[in-house]
From Swiss-Prot:
GO terms for cellular component: transcription factor TFIIA complex. It comes from the Eukaryota. It comes from Arabidopsis thaliana. The keyword Cytoplasm does not apply. It holds the Pfam family TFIIA_gamma_C. The keyword Cell inner membrane does not apply. This is Transcription initiation factor IIA subunit 2. TFIIA is a component of the transcription machinery of RNA polymerase II and plays an important role in transcriptional activation. TFIIA in a complex with TBP mediates transcriptional activity.
Length: 106
């Protein structure tokens, strides 16, 4: 299964990358193994989001910027509101990156 490396830019992905870098620098982990861990992280995040997340959320906000490049949409919203069945969250700025899932099956 092919995966995107999108989730490496999430908070948990950046923490994992930083920790792996520290382990490689200290000699605790080989660079090859660190890469394998990141590839597995990409696969695990994709599988978890496909199978475990069932909540639907609506998003409203002011579109500041949008871009479409290499089959990837990027939207930057300002004063966005995320609303689910039981909760509402307001954020001043959010970046949404969306990829065509058909690319994963190629």
């Amino acid at each position: 299964m092919a995966t995107f490396e999108l989730y490496r830019r999430s908070t948990i992905g950046m923490c994992l990358t930083e920790t792996l870098d520290e382990m490689v620098q200290s000699g605790t982990l080989s660079p090859e193994l660190a890469i394998q861990v990141l590839v597995q992280f990409d696969k695990s995040m994709t599988e978890a989001l496909e199978s475990q997340v069932k909540t639907k959320v609506s998003i409203k906000g002011h579109l500041h910027t949008y871009r479409f490049c290499d089959n990837v949409w990027t939207f930057i919203l300002q004063d966005a509101m995320f609303k689910s069945d039981d909760r509402q969250e307001n954020v001043s700025r959010v970046k949404i990156v969306a990829c065509d899932s058909k690319l994963l099956t190629q």
